[in-house]
């Protein structure tokens, strides 16, 4: 008999990510990651899939993390990043003929994101360096916990990292033969998305070089001469661009981004830069699809940055697109022809194109199965290549969600899913939980979601939708929430409850719960201040006061302007009107507040304000603080805390529903 899923089962789920074909196509490297329950951490190792035998073998071992496998141009060496010898991750290379991996760097600040030069003689890595720090340092100077920290820029802290202390991501070239290092960038800016030109003479990267520490400023793409260091700006200095790659013939640059016409609600588009003519063209102006991964899940560890992959003839490239609850692979020609190569009810988070260009190898997650590797031949059916989660799927009862769609009063179509309890007995009724995603510009979709499975196993139905503001349904839809927080988005999620009850007569309309995190936490707070329809609520990493959020969040100083469309100093009352804290006196729903103590995106003072207000008024509430947890607790937090979080949620609903 199959077992019901529990919170602890996150320790049994394996993540299979970042597939990379070898240049000859005979094998592919990928990363397998899993919770290390004993150490309350994560373990990642590099595996190799052999295309001839269909089998996989591990190439790294141990309880640390080895990630980012990248083949040398001749396919004889594999580079990767690992923290196997200490806390700081370093660059290693391994021969395909066997033997021990060779460590190439020993930088106390760690390195990331390896990228081979076309001649195979060097590897580019990213290193975060603060003021006074160097790639030549052999020891990391420990920060004096009593030393004052001077702050002069707006972006002085970052969720998951804390105080930045003037550290920026720099690009460093490492010699494969000698290990000698050369720092290629030194601007006071984070440099990302690097790529070499085919001849190895140029390097493209993205950065905010405005000389102001303000994350809201334009993020541009630059081409650097590796001989002289001269820079050429590619993009128009009025948007956010990155994820660039050179065409094989060296003439074009494919890149993704937008001109922020709708601020951070703008769809990511595909662009082509003609290097010979110095002309930048948007290839997908008429495509109403977000060309990036915006799908939310909680079972994938790691993942990969997916940049455009060119065809050998330099006539087009492949990218990921977010559409209607799925992520798929899109082909875009240099003439602007666009069509999906694969768009099924699944979550593709990373892929690699075979050298013969006949098929992809992709990391795919489905609603009833955590991630695996699949072969996706052009125009043919997919084939599952790994069985990392076979045992988990075989031994557990997994609830299959039903797709729902409904029209709102103003004629907007809203999409979502209804997941029923894992076990249903006769005519027994069961409670319903409304789950609201964060962002707000993200998307629920066709993926395995452990939190929902845990609740379904406990006897709850779960309804989760993509309200206005979500990605996946076009530019007008994703932009609709801006300036209307708690408006039509509130109507959308409340109607989702009505639709679920209408579809399933077993749902008890008197036993309703609501939960959500980040923007979903804001909506949970907003809902319990507007209606007493729900009998229990759990708000996570939430927002309660937009006025204070403006100054305490790492993105608050521009997020409130962009999203609420109210100026902090000119429209203070309007920000207060949209703050759930204003309506705390209306709350009658028992409210559990979950928050990470090191959340710099939605700082814990947001939870504290709400908790104190409710407690002072005699409302039923509880605050649970997670030490050292960032905004990403539910996805990448310490495993033990992730398990406790899920148990807190289900226990609160068990108690009140």
Curated annotation (Swiss-Prot):
This is Uncharacterized peptidase YuxL. GO terms for molecular function: serine-type endopeptidase activity. Pfam families: PD40 (PF07676), Peptidase_S9 (PF00326). The active site is at residues 518, 631. Keywords: Hydrolase, Protease, Serine protease. The gene is yuxL. The lineage of its organism: Bacteria, Bacillati, Bacillota, Bacilli, Bacillales. It is an enzyme of class 3 (hydrolase). GO terms for biological process: proteolysis. Its EC number is 3.4.21.-. Coiled coil: none annotated. Belongs to the peptidase S9C family.
């Amino acid at each position: 008999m199959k077992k019901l899923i529990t919170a602890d089962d996150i320790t049994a789920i394996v993540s299979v990510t970042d597939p990379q074909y070898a240049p000859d196509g005979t094998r592919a490297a990928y990363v397998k990651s899993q919770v290390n329950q004993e150490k309350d951490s994560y373990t990642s190792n590099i595996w190799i899939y052999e295309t001839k035998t269909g089998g996989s073998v591990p190439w790294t071992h141990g309880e640390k993390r080895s990630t980012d496998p990248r083949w040398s141009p001749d396919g004889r060496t594999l580079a990767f990043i690992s923290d196997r010898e200490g806390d700081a991750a370093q660059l290693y290379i391994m021969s395909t003929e066997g033997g021990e991996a060779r460590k190439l760097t020993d930088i106390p600040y760690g390195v990331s994101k390896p990228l081979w030069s076309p001649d195979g003689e060097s590897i580019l890595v990213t290193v975060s360096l603060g003021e006074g720090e160097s790639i030549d340092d052999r020891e990391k100077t420990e920060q004096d916990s009593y030393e004052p920290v001077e702050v002069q820029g707006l972006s002085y802290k970052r969720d998951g990292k804390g105080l930045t202390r003037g550290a920026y991501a720099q690009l460093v070239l490492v010699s494969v033969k000698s290990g000698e290092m050369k720092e290629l960038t030194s601007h006071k800016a984070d440099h990302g998305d690097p790529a070499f030109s085919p001849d190895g003479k140029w390097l493209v990267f993205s950065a905010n070089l405005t000389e102001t520490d303000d994350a809201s400023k334009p993020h541009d793409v630059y081409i650097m001469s590796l001989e002289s260091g001269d820079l050429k700006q590619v993009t128009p200095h009025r948007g956010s661009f990155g994820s660039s790659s050179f065409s094989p013939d060296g003439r074009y640059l494919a890149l993704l981004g937008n001109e922020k016409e709708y601020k951070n609600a703008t769809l990511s588009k595909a662009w082509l830069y003609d290097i010979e003519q110095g002309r930048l063209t948007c290839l997908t102006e008429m495509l109403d699809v977000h060309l990036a991964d915006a799908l939310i899940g909680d079972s994938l560890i790691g993942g990969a940055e997916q940049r455009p992959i060119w065809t050998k003839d330099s006539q087009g490239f492949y990218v990921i697109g977010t559409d209607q609850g799925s992520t798929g692979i899109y082909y875009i020609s240099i003439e602007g022809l666009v069509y999906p190569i694969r768009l099924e009810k699944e979550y593709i988070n990373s892929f690699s194109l075979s050298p013969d260009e006949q098929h992809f190898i992709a990391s795919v997650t489905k609603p009833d199965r955590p991630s695996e590797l699949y072969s996706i031949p052009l125009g043919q059916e997919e084939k599952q290549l790994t069985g990392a989660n076979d045992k988990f799927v075989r031994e557990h009862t997994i609830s299959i969600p039903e797709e729902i769609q409904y029209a709102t009063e103003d004629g907007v179509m809203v999409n979502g899913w209804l997941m029923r309890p894992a076990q249903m007995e006769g005519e027994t009724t069961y409670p319903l939980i409304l789950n609201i995603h964060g962002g707000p510009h993200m998307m629920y979709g066709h993926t395995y979601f452990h939190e929902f499975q845990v609740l379904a196993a406990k006897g709850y139905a779960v309804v989760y939708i993509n309200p206005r503001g979500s990605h996946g349904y076009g530019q007008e839809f994703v932009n609709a929430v801006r300036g209307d927080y708690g408006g039509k988005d509130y109507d959308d999620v409340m109607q989702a409850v009505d639709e679920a009850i209408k579809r399933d007569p077993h749902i008890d309309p008197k036993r309703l719960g609501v939960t959500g995190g980040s923007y979903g936490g804001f909506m949970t707070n907003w809902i319990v201040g507007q209606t007493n329809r729900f009998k229990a609520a759990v708000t996570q990493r939430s927002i309660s006061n937009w006025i204070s959020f403006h100054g305490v969040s790492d993105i608050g100083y521009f997020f409130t302007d962009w999203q609420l469309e109210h100026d902090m100093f000119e429209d203070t009352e309007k920000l207060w009107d949209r703050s759930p804290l204003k309506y705390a006196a209306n709350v009658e729903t028992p409210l559990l507040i979950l928050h990470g103590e090191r959340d710099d995106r939605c700082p814990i003072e947001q939870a504290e304000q709400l908790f104190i207000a409710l407690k002072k008024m005699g409302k039923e509430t509880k605050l649970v603080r997670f030490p050292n947890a960032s905004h990403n607790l539910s996805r990448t937090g310490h495993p033990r805390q992730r398990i406790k979080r899920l148990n807190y949620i289900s226990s609160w609903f068990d108690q009140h529903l």
